Amino acid sequence: MIVTTKSGRNSERMAINVRLENSFTMPTRITPVANGVDYMTNYNEARVARGFSEYYSEDKIKNTRLGTDRYIYPDVNWYDLLFKDFSTSQNANINLRGGGKKVEYFLNFSAHNEFGMLRKTSHSNYFTGDNMQKYTFQSNVSAYATKTTRVSLKMTTQLMNKYGTSGVASDLFNYTMTVNPVDFPAVYPSRADLDHVPFGNAPSWDGSGTQTNPYALLNQGYCNRFWGNVLATVTIDQDLAAITEGLRISGLASFANYTYSSVWNKLTPHFYTLTNYWMTPEGDYEYDLSTIGTPGNNFLEGGRSNSGNRIMNFQAKIDYARKFGKHDVSAALIYMQKEKRLNVPSASQSDILPFREQGLAGRVTSGFDSRYMAEF
């Protein structure tokens, strides 16, 4: 498929256009979730209504309401902890357009920088938010080699880089809407005897495992993904009226290359759960922690993936169109061929071999008095 983009124009002066934009993005609506006190109160009422005893004690509800200690009586707003209120994006575009009687040109460069809604945290040495950068380079040049020969070259390059947490943003959002706000804090204070971040956690409801800590998933690692598209097209159009009126030939050759690569690094967070707490004579709380769940590690384990393909197209066309009195006659003959190869083929036979396609098509039409037509 050939896409027609802007071209140059015959102008004595070069036209330069520059556009800069900055925009703000925010959710239209976020479903409100209950705070810790309302959650525990409603949960107890639901249990009592079904003939069960209350699950959360009045002491826990009271101290959570008073904010006595955020590690012993947590009340976590997971959404506010992981997501920002708004994000920003920037766009820049510059293009040059001009030419003369024999050469026309159009040059364009655009850049786009966009930040997502995820927050950058202070508990990791890498960027935990999400950022996308996109660049587009475009060059269209058309020249008349002779009075009857026109040559055009169109080149477009698109580059895009996405960087962010190894977690999936949609999954993190779902967790912020469903994870219990009072069972554990997002993270406990660091201690001198620890060489890692002590993320909070607690046993699951059925005791078979642990719960999900969205904040730990946000800090679990990062992923860097890159996409690249390059397209170059050369066209030649030759008017052969010197041989016979209405005859012309044209040719097209194009090359397209697509690449994708991703690199990710992840670690297993260290999870801790509260096992005991007490109040000191000075009126301060102290507590004991123990590890829970899968043992964590302090190093990032990486992986990568690559893919891509390249496509070459060739097309030749002969056109003839002429009018003899009330008769209109036209004919066309088109030949095309296409070859596609994978940049990173697998061991399978279908991936190693290129995909090739050839085609030949023709058409002849005849019309009379703009009312009758035949086509073959």
Regions found by a protein language model. Give the residues of each.
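Repeated loop/turn-to-beta-strand initiation elements of outer-membrane beta-barrel proteins
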Residues: K102-Y105, T148-V151, A242-L247, K326-V329, ...
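Membrane-proximal, glycine/serine-rich, low-complexity loop/turn segments characteristic
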Residues: I2-N229, T235-A241
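Sequence/structural signature of outer-membrane beta-barrel proteins
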Residues: T25, E114-G116, M160-K162, Y258-Y260, ...
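Outer-membrane beta-barrel proteins and related beta-barrel translocases across Gram-negative bacteria
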Residues: N174-T176, P185, L252-S261, N309-I311
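Flexible, surface-exposed loop regions and adjacent strand-edge segments
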Residues: V33-Y39, H123-T128, V168-M177, N265-N276, ...
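Outer-membrane beta-barrel transmembrane domain signature of Gram-negative proteins
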Residues: P74-R97, F184-L194, F199, L267, ...
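Transmembrane beta-barrel domains of bacterial outer-membrane proteins
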Residues: A145, T235, G246-S250, S254-A256, ...
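Extended hydrophobic secondary-structure segments that form protein cores and membrane-embedded regions
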Residues: V18, R248-A256, S330-M336
